From Swiss-Prot:
Glycosylation sites: N35, N289
Major subcellular location class: membrane
Gene Ontology MF terms in the entry: oxidoreductase activity; oxidoreductase activity, acting on a sulfur group of donors, disulfide as acceptor
Subcellular location: Membrane
Keywords: Glycoprotein, Membrane, Transmembrane, Transmembrane helix
Membrane topology category: Multi-pass membrane protein
Highest taxon in the source lineage: Eukaryota
Membrane is among the record's keywords: yes
Organism: Caenorhabditis elegans
Protein name: GILT-like protein C02D5.2
Length: 323
């Protein structure tokens, strides 16, 4: 008589390959690609569940009786069952680690989704309409002038000072004052010899203005002194403006205005003046944003305001006052 009966239960050969394949797939994906396709993960987990089910059924088979005529499966020894249980427990442990890892590193569902192939896709947030703040432009204002020119003196008193008082604090004007006018400078070795339209005294005051501008650089520092010097008829009178505005710089400015440095600075202003297109034919020559503006001679504030975009409230108030 046969010792064992035929059975329809799965063979133990099915358990180990399924468990091994599923475990290795999960372990590899866990180490290499945490964002593997969800479809692939689903297939792997289904195979793992089938393997666990098959092994469970195999371990719970009843011992076959000795009356079987066509034995197929041997009696399962306790040692064999223990080995298969190790496979099951190991697989469950790996699966638990994987699920814990995925739960801790899952992407933000509010910003991600699953594409057709099962991979993560990132949604681009739809931003509402944005209102762009207008960019405030800087107005470049260049004034080409000379110290004893009556038209320049009038422009300084009536237009430049007023415009700077109203708009200078806005930090939207790039002001450059170039004292030279219709002078001429000739290079003599390491020095220059200059002739000015209104005589040698004008050259000295022009040189003093250039020294002050070169020394302080910023309009809010040099402009009070230059406004004071404009129209003076002697260097000594112009130096009083240095005493009033820059008392600690008196000796330095006097030496600069009467020496080689002052003449060199005047010659540099002459180069800037000579580069203008078209060439100057009137002093003061006013340039706003690279273009000569003759109307600015009569209302500098209005013309600078019209060049400012957007127009500040100080300009709006000034323009209303003209009506």
């Amino acid at each position: 008589m046969s010792k064992y009966l035929r059975t329809s239960h799965p063979s133990p050969l099915i358990c180990r390959p399924i468990l091994t394949f599923s475990s290795l797939h999960i372990l590899t994906a866990f180490l290499i690609s945490g964002n593997s396709s969800y479809i692939n993960w689903s297939v792997t987990i289904i195979l793992l569940i089938l393997g666990l089910y098959a092994c469970h059924r195999f371990l719970n088979m009843k011992k076959l009786t000795r009356d079987a005529q066509e034995p197929l499966l041997p009696h399962i020894r306790p040692s064999t069952r223990n080995k298969i249980r190790k496979y099951i427990y190991g697989t469950i442990f790996i699966l638990s680690i994987f699920l814990l890892y995925r739960s801790l590193n899952s992407p933000d569902t509010s910003k991600h989704g699953i594409g057709r192939n099962g991979d993560f896709i990132e949604y681009e947030p739809k931003a509402g309409p944005t209102i762009k703040e207008p960019v405030e432009n800087i107005v470049k204002l260049d004034v080409y002038m000379e110290a004893q020119c009556p038209d320049t003196s009038r422009f300084f008193r009536q237009q430049l000072k007023k415009a700077w008082d109203i708009l200078g604090r806005l930090n939207r004007i790039e002001l450059n004052v170039i004292p030279f006018g219709k002078a001429r400078c000739t290079e003599k070795g390491n020095d220059f010899e200059c002739q000015c339209q209104h005589g040698p005294t004008e050259c000295q005051i022009n040189q003093l203005m250039n020294c002050v501008i070169d020394r302080f650089g910023f309009p809010h520092r040099y402009l009070p002194g230059v406004l004071c010097m404009q129209g003076k008829y002697s260097l000594d009178e112009a130096m009083k403006c240095v005493t009033e505005n820059y008392p600690s710089e008196y000796e330095r400015m006097r030496e600069c205005a009467s020496g080689t440095r002052g003449r060199r600075l005047l010659a540099l202003s002459g180069q800037k003046t000579a580069s203008l297109t078209p060439a100057i034919d009137f002093i003061p020559w006013i340039v706003i944003n690279g273009s000569r503006n003759s109307d600015a001679l009569y209302d500098l504030t209005q013309n600078v305001c019209e060049a400012m975009q957007p127009m500040p409230s100080a300009c709006k108030d000034y323009l209303r006052s003209l009506q």
